[in-house]
Design a protein with these regions (language model features):
Chain A
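N-terminal mature ectodomain segment of secretory-pathway/periplasmic proteins
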Residues: 34-118
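A short, amphipathic edge element
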Residues: 35-36, 67, 144-156, 205-210
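Short, solvent-exposed mixed-charge patches
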Residues: 266-267
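Boundary at the C-terminal end of the N-terminal hydrophobic targeting segment
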Residues: 22-26
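Short amphipathic beta-strand and strand-loop transition segments with alternating hydrophobic
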Residues: 73-77, 155-161, 215-216
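Bacterial N-terminal signal peptides that target proteins for export
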Residues: 1-11
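Gly/Pro-enriched, hydrophobic low-complexity segments
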Residues: 90, 101-103, 111-115, 121-125, ...
Length: 267, 400
C-alpha cells in the first residue's frame, strides 16, 4: 500500500535519479573516450621489442640534501603479457651489483626476484609492495612497473593546452585495490600521445605527487622516450629526478636473458 | 696465499685502466664488545678487526667470456686464526649458447630459508668471520650451468677441499678446547684431494621456486674429536664422506613467502657406524605488512622450525628449535633495516638471540650493528660453551 507520503518520497527519489541517469550516459561516453586515448597511446608504443638504458636517480629531501643512484635497465616486450625487466644497481656502492628481475603482468601480481651479490643469493620477493618506494625514492614500484591498459579504468576529462601543445586530460583509476592511488590525472599530447604530466592522488583523494616528463626523443622513427622525469611529493616536500641516457632498442634480447639464472650473471 | 694474491692483483692492475667500474673494493673496521669475561685466561675481551675485500671483473668476447677475481683479508687484534686471507673468487667463464662453463674458485648459494641453511653445501663456512655460516670460503671447481625450458641444470666437480676455519686459542666464540687445524683427519685416503661432485636442478613454476640437489664428497661440517696431544686436550676436525640429497622450495603468494629446505644424508661414519643415515628440515614462513601506518616502513614476521634427526652428542644446535623473528625495513634513502631473531630449543630451552641492523652513511659508507646473546645455557645444552660470549659488534665499511 503506497500512501501519499510514500508517493511523495518516491517522486523525490525519481527526480533525484533523473539527472544522474543523464550524467551516466554522458559518463559512459567519457569512459569510452578515455579508454580510446589509453589504447591509442599503448598501440603507438607497441612493437619496440626490447630496450636498454642507463638511469641516474637524484633524490632530494625538503632541506635540499641530495643522494644519487646509478642504475642500468633492460626491458623485453612480451606479447599478451606485461614486460620482463632487469635493473642493475651500480651505486650507491654498498649495493653495487644488486640486480632486480621482474615479470610484470597485466592484472596478476608481478613476479620479482632480487640478487644479493655479497651472499650470491637470489631471493624471490613478494610483489605486494607495489605502493612501496623503489630504492627510497619518490617512485613507487607501481610507477616504474610496465604500464598496461588493463591496469586502470579511464575517464576522459577535457582538452588542455600548455607549453604550446594540445593535450588530452584523462583520469585513470587503478584496478588493483592494493595500489597506493585512488586515481591519476594524466596529460597526453594530441599529436604523439606522449605523457607530459601525471598528478597522483592518494587513497583519500588528496594530491600526493606530480610527475613531469621532459626532453622527449624519438627512436626507430616511432617510439618516444623522455630523458627527464621529475617526481615531486607535495605532502613531504621530497623529490626524485630521473635522468635517462643511452637508450638502445632491438638489441636482440630473448627470454633466456630474463631468468633467475641470468640474474646472477647480470652486470 | 697472500703473496699469490698480491701477484694476481698486480698482474690484473693494467687491465683496470680499461674500465674503472670493473673494480670495487671495501675496507671495514669492526669493533666487538663482549659483555662477560672470557672463560679461558688465554682469551681476550673487546676486540678490533680490519677487513679488506676487492672485486675485479672483466667481460670480453661480446660478453661471452668473463673473469672475476675477489680477494679477501682480515687482520684481527687478538685471534691469529681470525687474521686470514682467502680467495673468495677467481674464475673464468665461457658462455656457449645455453651453457656456461666455469673454471676456478667460486662462491655460490643454494636455498631459501632465513634461520638455517641446510641445502647450501658447495662452499665451506668461514666461521671465524661469523657464527651464522653466511660467510664462505672460495671453492675451486669446474662447473657447468645449462638452462633449458624444464629448468636450470648445474654440475660441479671439486678437486680441492677447503677446511672449516675455527677461532684460535686467543679467540672468542670457540669451544673450551682449541681446534687443531693443522691436523685435520679425513675418512677418504685422498684427504683434501678427494674429488667431490654435485648436481643441481632448479626451476620456477608460477609461484613456486624449487630446487633438487645431490652432493657426493667430503662433508663440509667436521666432527670434532677430543684428543690429548702432549698432555693438552685438543679437538681434531674429522671430515667424513657424505652423500646428500637436498630439496628446497619456496611458494610466494601475495605477502606470504612459504619456505622449506630438507636434506637426507648418508655418512660413512668411522666412529658410530650405526648412525649413518640422518635427515634435517627447516621450514616456515615470512609475512610482510607493507607501508605501516601510511609510512614507507615494512615489517615482516619470520617463523621457522628446525629439525635434525641426529640426537645425543651428534645433535647439532638446530635439532628441535623454533626461530621467530622480525624484519623492519624503513625503505628510506639510507636503506635502513633491522632483523631480530630468537631461536629456542624446544627440548632444552636454550636460546640464541640475534639482532642485525644496517644503514648507509652518505654515498660511500655503511654502518652495521650486530648483537648475539646465548641464554639459558645450562651445562647440558649445546650453547653451554658460548655462555660467556654474548657480544655487540659495530662495523663501519667504506666502499670505493
Amino acid at each position: 500500500m503506497i500512501n501519499k507520503k510514500h508517493y511523495a518520497l518516491l517522486i523525490t527519489l525519481v527526480a533525484m535519479l533523473i539527472p544522474n541517469t543523464v550524467f551516466s550516459m554522458e559518463d559512459e561516453a567519457l569512459v569510452k573516450r578515455g579508454l580510446e586515448i589509453a589504447i591509442e597511446a599503448d598501440r603507438r608504443d607497441n612493437g619496440f621489442g626490447d630496450s636498454s638504458s642507463s638511469l641516474e636517480m637524484i633524490l632530494r629531501n625538503r632541506h635540499g640534501e641530495q643522494s644519487e643512484r646509478q642504475l642500468r635497465n633492460k626491458t623485453l616486450e612480451m606479447k599478451d603479457d606485461g614486460d620482463k625487466a632487469i635493473i642493475i644497481f651500480d651505486t650507491p656502492r654498498d649495493v653495487k651489483g644488486t640486480a632486480f628481475l621482474s615479470f610484470t603482468h597485466k592484472l596478476d601480481a608481478d613476479d620479482q626476484w632480487l640478487y644479493l651479490p655479497a651472499l650470491k643469493r637470489v631471493k624471490r620477493i613478494a610483489s605486494r609492495n607495489k605502493a612501496g618506494p623503489f630504492m627510497g625514492s619518490e617512485f613507487a614500484y607501481e610507477d616504474i612497473s610496465s604500464q598496461e591498459v588493463e591496469k586502470y579504468s579511464y575517464l576522459y576529462i577535457k582538452d588542455d593546452t600548455f607549453a604550446e601543445r594540445d593535450h588530452f586530460i584523462i583520469d585513470r583509476d587503478p584496478v588493483d585495490p592494493k595500489s597506493g592511488y585512488k586515481r591519476q590525472r594524466v596529460w597526453l599530447d594530441k599529436a604523439e600521445y606522449r605523457i607530459w604530466k601525471i598528478d597522483f592522488y592518494d587513497r583519500k583523494d588528496t594530491l600526493l605527487k606530480t610527475l613531469t616528463y621532459d626532453d622527449y626523443n624519438q627512436y626507430l622513427g616511432q617510439y618516444w622516450r623522455a630523458n627527464v622525469m621529475d617526481m615531486v611529493n607535495h605532502q613531504t616536500g621530497k623529490s626524485t629526478r630521473l635522468n635517462w641516457r643511452d637508450f638502445s632498442f632491438r638489441n636482440g634480447y630473448s627470454e633466456k636473458e630474463f631468468t633467475k639464472g641470468a640474474l646472477k650473471k647480470a652486470r | 696465499m697472500p703473496k699469490l694474491l698480491l701477484l694476481i692483483l698486480f698482474a690484473l692492475l693494467p687491465l683496470s685502466q680499461l674500465n674503472a667500474a670493473e673494480w670495487s673494493s671495501q675496507i671495514g673496521i669492526e669493533a666487538r664488545h663482549f659483555f662477560d669475561n672470557a672463560l679461558s685466561p688465554q682469551q681476550h675481551g673487546d676486540n678490533l678487526s680490519l677487513t679488506f675485500e676487492s672485486e675485479f671483473y672483466h667481460d670480453w668476447d661480446d660478453g661471452q667470456q668473463r673473469i672475476v677475481f675477489t680477494p679477501f683479508a682480515r687482520i684481527d687484534q687478538h685471534d691469529s686464526e681470525r687474521s686470514h686471507a682467502d680467495l673468495r673468487e677467481l674464475y673464468w667463464r665461457q658462455t656457449f649458447n645455453n651453457t656456461d662453463l666455469y673454471v676456478g674458485v667460486r662462491k655460490l648459494f643454494w636455498g631459501v630459508t632465513e634461520s638455517l641453511h641446510l641445502v647450501d653445501i658447495i662452499n665451506q663456512s668461514d666461521t671465524v668471520e661469523n657464527l651464522d655460516g653466511e660467510d664462505k670460503l672460495g671453492q675451486p671447481m669446474i662447473s657447468f650451468f645449462h638452462s633449458s625450458v624444464v629448468g636450470d641444470w648445474e654440475f660441479f666437480l671439486m678437486p680441492w677441499f677447503r677446511e672449516r676455519t675455527f677461532p684460535g686459542i686467543e679467540g672468542r666464540l670457540r669451544p673450551p678446547f682449541v681446534v687443531d687445524q693443522d691436523n685435520a683427519q679425513y675418512e677418504s685416503g685422498d684427504a683434501e684431494k678427494h674429488i667431490d661432485s654435485a648436481l643441481r636442478w632448479s626451476h620456477v613454476i608460477d609461484d613456486w621456486d624449487v630446487g633438487l640437489s645431490w652432493f657426493h664428497g667430503t662433508d663440509r661440517t667436521p666432527q670434532l674429536v677430543t684428543q690429548t696431544i702432549n698432555g693438552a686436550v685438543m679437538l681434531l676436525p674429522y671430515y667424513a664422506q657424505l652423500d646428500q640429497l637436498g630439496v628446497d622450495a619456496q611458494y610466494t603468494y601475495e605477502s606470504w613467502l612459504w619456505k622449506l629446505e630438507f636434506v637426507s644424508r648418508r655418512h660413512d661414519n668411522r666412529f658410530s657406524p650405526d648412525l649413518n643415515r640422518s635427515s634435517a628440515t627447516v621450514g616456515g614462513f615470512e609475512y610482510t605488512w607493507y607501508g605501516l601506518f601510511s609510512s614507507a616502513t615494512d615489517i615482516g614476521l619470520v617463523m621457522e622450525y628446525q629439525y635434525d634427526s641426529r640426537d645425543g652428542n651428534r645433535a647439532p644446535i638446530a635439532n628441535n628449535d623454533i626461530a621467530i623473528g622480525s624484519r623492519l625495513t624503513l625503505n628510506d634513502v639510507q636503506d635502513s633495516t633491522l632483523l631480530a631473531l630468537v631461536a629456542s630449543d624446544l627440548d632444552q630451552r636454550e636460546r640464541f638471540i640475534s639482532l642485525e641492523g644496517s644503514r648507509r652513511l652518505g654515498e660511500e659508507m655503511s654502518i652495521s650493528l650486530e648483537a648475539r646473546f646465548f641464554s639459558n645455557t645450562a651445562p647440558q645444552t649445546q650453547l653451554f660453551w658460548l655462555r660467556s660470549d654474548d657480544y655487540l659488534e659495530l662495523l663501519l665499511t667504506h666502499y670505493f
